[in-house]
Each structure stands twice: as structure tokens, then as C-alpha cells.
Amino acid sequence: MDAVNAFNQELFSLMDMKPPISRAKMILITKAAIKAIKLYKHVVQIVEKFIKKCKPEYKVPGLYVIDSIVRQSRHQFGTDKDVFGPRFSKNITATFQYLYLCPSEDKSKIVRVLNLWQKNGVFKIEIIQPLLDMAAGTSNAAPVAENVTNNEGSPPPPVKISSELAQAPTNSMPTVAQLPSSDAFAAVAQLFQTTQGQQLQQILQTFQQPPQPQSPALDSAVMAQVQAITAQLKTAPTQPPEQKTAFDKKLLDRFDYDDEPEAVEDSKKEDAAAISTAALATAAPPAPTAATPAVATAVPVPSATSPPPPQTPFGYPGDGVQQPAYTQHQSMDQFQPRMMPIQQDTMHHQVPLPPNGQMPGFGLLSAPPPFPPMPQPGMPQPGMAQPGLAQPGMAQPTMPQPGMPQPGMPQPGMAQPGLAQPGMAQPGMPQPAMPQPAMPQPGMAQPGVSPAPPVQPTFQSTFQPQNEPHSQKPHQQEMEVEQPCVTEVKRHVPESRKSRSRSPKRRRSRSGSRSRRSRHRRSRSRSRDRRRHSPRSRSQERRDREKERERRQKGLPQIKSETASVCSTTLWVGQLDKRTTQQDVASLLEEFGPIESINMIPPRGCAYIVMVHRQDAYRALQKLSRGNYKVNQKSIKIAWALNKGIKADYKQYWDVELGVTYIPWDKVKAEELESFCEGGMLDSDTLNPDWKGIPKKPDNEVAQNGGAETSHTEPVSPIPKPVPVPVPPIPVPAPITVPPPQVPPHQPGPPVVGALQPPAFTPPLGMPPPGFGPGVPPPPPPPPFLRPGFNPMHLPPGFLPPGPPPPITPPVSIPPPHTPPISIPNLVSGARGNAESGDSAKMYGSAGPPAAPTSLPTPPVTQPVSLLGTQGVAPGPVIGLQAPSTGLLGARPGLIPLQRPPGMPPPHLQRFPMMPPRPMPPHMMHRGPPPGPGGFAMPPPHGMKGPFPPHGPFVRPGGMPGLGGPGPGPGASEDRDGRQQQPQQQPPPQQQQQQQQPQQQPPQQSPSQQPAPAQQQPPQFRNDSRQQFNSGRDQERFGRRSFGSRVENDRERYGSRNDDRDNSNRERREWGRRSPDRDRHRDLEERSRRSSGHRDRDRDSRDRESRREKEENRKEKHEVADRAGGNKAVEPPLSQVGTIDTVSELNKGEAMATVVKPEESPAEVTSPVGPEKDPGSAAEPPR
């Protein structure tokens, strides 16, 4: 039964699509049917049920389903073993009766399918021929009801109907009623087309009195004409709804595909009948008049003979009236063929045509005199569905058909013969007709409206018809079948129409129109109002659909009533190789968006990745679950994971397919909402309006998920938490070294500077804090920063070594409030998002601008240093490093800022910009602006990104220890530029110098090696403050210096700062080279520690001129002078690059340059890499 259920769902999903149905959809349905072939009887029954219950526009697609299933089965299993064909043939007659309820324009498609079946021998001719006859209307020449029910007779019936019509006049009332409907239609159409309009006018003038409804005895053509005219006038009001319906059907067919289908099909079928009737009617010109009168008579009969307005619609119950109408129809037959098309057209035109007083009465629909194609209506079944079928467009006639035996009905069906006739009598007739129609209208379907002037009814009807036609046609057909009981039919029609209108759920307006029809007695204004609401309802539906589409694009699941949706942003990635690293997973997912954290579980071969945004997680899941994606040559699986915020009590509500936890409102405590956001987010659309603070909680949730991206303010709060942690670790150790000198410079804004410095730490920490947050204040920091999750993993190795003193701790504690915001923004946006470099962050943030650049520059530098120092301190530093390591989504970018002293200040500046009140030291201000210029600010970030992210984690740690050098002497030496670190750590730079004599360019190394850079950086920092162009140079330092090639003469670079800038690219390359060399000599952990430390310390040294650095510079100055000649040449290009960068910055200020050189020389001696690089550097120094 699973296959049957699958087929059922596939088939009925057609209702969700708009015809025509695509070939791919038909293939899916056919495949589902073939799969369920064992239960082929169920499949056949489902298809038949679909055809029976679907809207008219889906009838033909249902036939195509039968055709596709049978042909595929015959092709796949052979004609002998095909089970579907014989099974469908058992009930095929009833099935085609429902199929012929389709829009009249689709009937040709049904005939085409039958012809193909006959040609290809799908079914026997004995089965197909009756179906073709049914389509032609031949099968039910006698029983109009059948035709109406089947809605099959549109093309062929015309001939038989015409003959029947000819006979009908003499025949009993019922036949007359049937024939008149189509004949009247044709007659009316003809009258409109030809001079009949004038004739009708004359007749109306002559016989303005309402025609005698039951004057079948009127044999004279004049009497017939008069009756036709009067009938038109009276029926126009009574039929307006019907005509409206027919016209509406046509309009809807063309424009409103949703509603029209049913009505259109019915109307078309009726039109076919009408066309056939029209053909017969052509015989007698007076007949049209008579037909009109028949309808009019019918109307008058209800109004005059009997007071039942409803009766008129169905009853034109003057059977006598029908007879006269029929007689008239005979006379009008000549006009009928022409009139049929005309009437249909007129129905369209009638809306505009006021002259057709009756037209207005009917439904303005016929107003447009589209003489064109209403003829088809006549063709359908004049006798059969005369009102409805006879007039394809005239679904409305079907309504009258019951009462009007179809004389009146046909007219409405025809194109509103009544209307058409008014059109015929357009000038004169309309007016007389108008008054008369007023009566017929009441008698007709619009008792209430009828009193209103015909014109008003016309407009009202126009509105109704459009809506009504769809519902009316099917109902009309039914009514025609029940013509004998006009009154009953009328009552039933509204309901049936309603039901049908309901079936086509496409249009609410349709349903409204149906309801209106049933309420014809009520005012049309009401129907109009309903119709007016329908567009609103449709627009509301459209808005709902658009909103749902937006929610799907955002990855949000469906909303359940009174249920809070906690959408997970956590993804589970499984089947990972045990060697898979966090970086591998991050590289897989970071393309989709920022990552908040990654939790690796190697024993299980899986990882839990918390994305910042639900949309990013949704896109990652959609893409990675479709293709065969591999990590380390091993295919992975991905799925939603329950977010951490969902406690065990709520796991029962977890939906793994949608990645959402649906928690009923009564189970949710408002205070728990915030906790739900961990690893997920609250769907604000599903929250109880009574919960207070929910908006904030969602924001927090966003902040937590989005971390830095979401909001800097929140990160700030988390950062303060991290700040306390960092304080113990004191990323400040490096800062401590540099802090004394920097403190004075920062002190210019002492309070702010003090706070800023701690913030500076915090920002640097902020960079780490993201990782840090997860470590120390996991909840707050992680949300603000993406790295937090990752940082813990990477930081430990690099950060443990540097254990700097907590001198900066106070600043950290002080700045936390301010710093967190600033640092967080940079970290989040800069580290992750920009990941490019501190420079970019600093330049963009120019954090300087928001905050006092003067204070900021120092804090940023201090912060980087503190971060590096923090590395030494396991708690904070580890996190800080991790922040870079969180490079998963930009950790390295975070490191990059640390690497470049100017870069670090900029990120801090950015953070400080968050804290505009803070004053920034002049140095920082200068740096900020230079990056701001953009030329350098932009490039450095990018350049830094490329080289730094990889180098940052490993290379910088070495440099970091160098700065931290005071603490870890050996670690410093091991730093990527170990030489410089060692010199600083080892006061006797002579030995180091001996080792790294070629590294006399160590001034440049100092940047790479934090100790020397720290010393040099003070001068550089001074240079920044002293030289206004430092901004550009700083940018170069950050962007180029790190990348600068150390191959060039360190001395030249050191001596010529321009050279240093030129060599910035080389240095960057050399940094990359150094990392490999160092990797060879040192452990990865040491590298990472040094690299992180290095960057931070370089910035710290540059930003802060520490007394130690000054002293070392003094000592090293002598050594540098001695070694300047030989050591520079010997100095390895890598170390030279780092030193050169610093030198160039230092050289910007001559005094600074001098100081830096001594520092560099000790660094050279200290770093063991120097000797390795000596050969290359030796060549350079001679330059």
C-alpha cells in the first residue's frame, strides 16, 4: 500500500500546480503508478476519483494520466499483459462524462486523445466510438440532461440540436425550452450583429409591454419578435447573472485561470450546445426574437405570471412561454447562428454596452460585443445543456435553463441572448428592455437586484458573472439536466455551483460568485462586495506565500500554532577520518558563513559545528547533503544536530529532519528562552506575544550565534568576562615589557588610555576573546565571536608558553567594558569576517576614528602584545591564540592583526571606534588614518590575509615568545624569528649576533621576532607619532612588511625605509619561508606559540616602547654598529624581512631607526634561524 499511497500523493499534487502539467510531472506520476501495478485496481480507482473530484481545468490532465499510464504499461509489459487498459475501460464511460465537464476549449484535446487511442489501438473502437459520440453530443440528442451532466456535446451536437430545435417549436414545452436556449442565443447574437438590433428596437417600441410569457401560440413573426424582445428585456434582468456568468467565464478563461476552469468548461460546453442551437436557429430570423422573448417571457412569466423571482431563472417556468419562445426561436433560427457568436461577443461587450439595457441587467460581461466566438456556444447542445452547453460562455444560461427550459437559459448561455438582444435593440431596445429587464431581473436570478435599474444590475452582474460563471456553468449543466423542475433546479444550481466553485479552490471570488448566485435574490452589491474581498484574500494568500518563501530561504521551518520554534544552527558532520583536523572541517563549512564553534570528537569520527546564522547552516546542509563531499579523501555525512540549549526535557520535541525543536508555549518558561539559543536561535515569529523580553532574547541569541557579527554590544559584555580571565593570564606579559613606554604615550589620555589599554588588551584579547569567550565565558564570548569555539583547540599550544606578567591586567579589567565592544567587533568582523589583518580592521575600523586614535594606537598594540603575552598565560592567551586559530572562519585573520603592529591597532581602533569616547594616542591616530586612506589599509589586510593566516598561527607564535621573551628566553629563540626573540630574551645579544651576524637587519626581524620588534616598535611607534606619513608606512608595514622579502639587504632596508617598503612583498614571502625552516628546526607547537606571540609582541613592541626595549636597543646599538657590515649580509632573508619591516617603520623616524638597529642586531644573534638564512642574507648585505 505504500506504493499506492505514494501514487495517490503524486497524483493529487497536481492540484498544487497550474496547468499545463509538465512532462516531468507526468513521468513521475506514471512511474508511481507502474510501481504500484500489483494494486492496479487501486491505482485505477484513484485516477477515476481524481477526475471526478478535480476542478475542470484538471480534467484533461487527468485524462493524460490515464493515457500515460496505459501506454507505458503496454510498452513495458506488452499489450497482452497490460492490466491498466482493461481496468480503465470498465468504467470509462462514467469517467469521460466527468472529463467532459472540462472547459469547452479543452474538449478538443479529449477528442484528440480518443483519436490517438483509436489510431494506436489502445482501446477497441467499440469503447472509443461512444466516447467520441459523447463529445459530439450525438449520444444524448434526446436527453438534454445527460448532455448537461456529461458536458460532452459541444461540436457535433449543433447539427442534431439544430434539427431538434427546428422540431422543438412544435414539440412540447420542454423541448422548446431546451432548443430555445440555444436558438435564443443564436437569435440574440444575430440580432446584435445585423439590423436585428433595429428591428428589436422597433418591436420593443411597438410592444413595450412585457411579452406574454406563455404566448406559445404567437405564430406571427412580429409577435415572435416582440416576444423575443420583451423576453430579452425581462430576461436581461433575470438572466444578467447568467450572462454575467457566461461572460465572466470567458473573461476568466482568458485572465483568471484559477477560477475559470470549472465555469469555463461548463460554459464552453454550454456554448457548444448553443452553437448547435444557433445553427438550427439560423433557419428562422424571427426565431431569435422569439428566443429572446422566450427568455424574456420566461422572466416575465415568473414576474407577471408568478411572483417567484427564483422561478424565472430556472423556470421561465412558463412552459407556455418556452413554447412561444421556441416558436420565436424557429423564426429566429436564421439569426441564431449569427447571433450565437454575436451574443457571446456581446456578452463580453455588454459590460460596456449600456444600450443593451438587458445586457447590463444580465451581467455586463456580454457588454463587449465580441461577435466573435460565442457561436461555439450555440454549437454545444442546444437541446442538451442548452443553457449551459448551448452557450459555452453562457454558464449562466445553465441557471435559467431549469426554469427557462432553456430557452431563456440558452440565451444567457449563448452570450446572454437576452443581453445580445438588448444589444440588438441596443439603441431603442435597451431602454425599453431596461425597464422590462428590471422586472425580469427580479423574476430572474436577481430578484433583489432586478428592481434596481437594469444598468445597475448590469454592472453588478458584471462583477458577479465573472465570479459566478465558473461556479454557474457546472451548476447550470446540472440544472439543465433537471430542467423539468425549474424551481428545484434553481435552488440546486446555487448549491451545486457553490460546490463546484468550492472544488475550484483557486479563486475565492468564484466561491463568492457562486454564493452570490445562490443569493441572487439578495442584492448584487453584496456579491460585488464579496468579490471585492476576494482580491484581498488573494493578496493575503500571496503575502503569506511570499512570507513562507522568505522563511524557507532563511532555512526556517514551518510555523506551528502556539508552538515556539527553536531552530538549531548546529550541524553534525560524520564519517570523518580520525586524522581530520578542526581546520579541515572549518574549511569545508566556512564558505557558507561564519562558524561559531567546532567540537571535534575524533573517536566517533564526527564533529559538531555551530554556525552563526541559521541560513548559513541550512545552505550548508542542503549543499553538502546532496553531493558526495569528502574530507581527507573520505565521504562525509551531514545532518542537523540538537543544539546545546535544548535540555533533556525538550528533546522529545526535536525534529531532526527540519532541525527545529517545536516546544508548546505551555511547556516553555519565558526565563528559559535565552538558554535555548545556545547553538541555535529562536524563531521570533513563533514566540508568544505575552512573553516579555523575547525580542531581546532573540537578539541575544542572534548575538550568541552570530557572535561578533550579530552585535558588538553583546560581545562586549561577553568580553568583559573574558577580560577578567585574560587578566590572570595577562596577555600583557609582552605588554608589560612594552607597557612602561607605551603607558606614558597612552597616558596622554591616562584614564582613557588606561581603560583603553586594557580594552586594547581586551581587543587583542577580543580577538582571542572570541575563542577566549568560549574558554572563559563560553556563553557570552562564543556568541559574539565565531572563533570562540575554535580558539580553545588551537590556542593551548601557542599560548601556554608565554606567561606574561599581569601588569596590564588592571587595564584589562578596566577596559573590559569598553574594550569588549571594540575588540569584539574587530574580532568578529575583523578577525573572522575580515580575517584579512589587523590592518584592515584597523583601517576600516579606523577604530581610531571612533575612539581617540591616540589612546587606541597604544591599546591596540598593547592588546596584541597582551594577547601574545596571554599566550604565555594559558587561560586568556590560549583563547586569544585560539581566536586566531579559530581561523576556521577567520582565526588567522585575527592573528594577522596581531602580527602587524599597525594592524593590531587598527582592529583595536575598530573596536575603539565602537568606543568613540576613548581618546587615542597620537601614534594610534596616525596609524588609524593611514589605514583609513585605504590604499594601504585595504591592501595590507588582503596581503596579510593570504600569507598571514597560514603563517600567523605557526610563525607568529615564535615572534610572540620573543616579545614574551622576557618570560621565555628559550621560547623566544625558538620563535619563528628565533634570533630576535633570543636576543631580547638573552640580554647578551653578542652571542646571538655572532650566530645571526647576517641578521643585523634583524631590525626587520624584530617585527617577526617579537622581542626585537618590541624594541624597534617603540621607535616605530614613535615614528608613527612623529611622522605623519606613518599611516601609509604603517599600512605598508602591516601589509607589505610582513610580506616584505627579507632577501634584500637588511642594511639597505634598515638604512632605507623605502627599500623596506619595496621589500614588503618579499618579506611576506620570506615569512612563509621562515615558517617552513622553523618548522624543520622546531616543534609545531613552539611555532604556533611563537607565531601568535610574535605577532602580538611585534605589535606591542611597535606600539609600546618599553624601557626594556630601550635598554636593549642601547646595548644592541653598539652590537648592531659592529655587525652592521658583516652580519647584515649574513642575516637570513627571513629574519631580515621581519627586521627590515620594523626597520623601515623605525627608519621613518631616524632616531627610532637608530634605536631599532641595536635591537635588531641582538635579535639577530639570538635567533638561530639567522645562521640558516645567512647565506642568502650575506649576499644581500653587500648590496
UniProtKB/Swiss-Prot annotation:
GO terms for cellular component: nucleoplasm; nucleus. The modification N6-acetyllysine is found at K49. Residues 1-139 form the CID domain. The modification Phosphoserine is found at S154, S717, S1042. Residues 367-380, 399-410, 429-440, 800-823, 920-952 have a biased composition (Pro residues). Residues 569-643 form the RRM domain. Its main location: nucleus. Residues 457-469, 1136-1145 have a biased composition (Polar residues). Residues 499-536 have a biased composition (Basic residues). One of its GO terms (biological process) is negative regulation of termination of RNA polymerase II transcription, poly(A)-coupled. Interacts with POLR2A; via C-terminal heptapeptide repeat domain (CTD) phosphorylated at 'Ser-2' and 'Ser-5'. Anti-terminator protein required to prevent early mRNA termination during transcription. Together with SCAF8, acts by suppressing the use of early, alternative poly(A) sites, thereby preventing the accumulation of non-functional truncated proteins. Mechanistically, associates with the phosphorylated C-terminal heptapeptide repeat domain (CTD) of the largest RNA polymerase II subunit (POLR2A), and subsequently binds nascent RNA upstream of early polyadenylation sites to prevent premature mRNA transcript cleavage and polyadenylation. This is SR-related and CTD-associated factor 4. It comes from Mus musculus. The lineage of its organism: Eukaryota, Metazoa, Chordata, Craniata, Vertebrata. The gene is Scaf4.
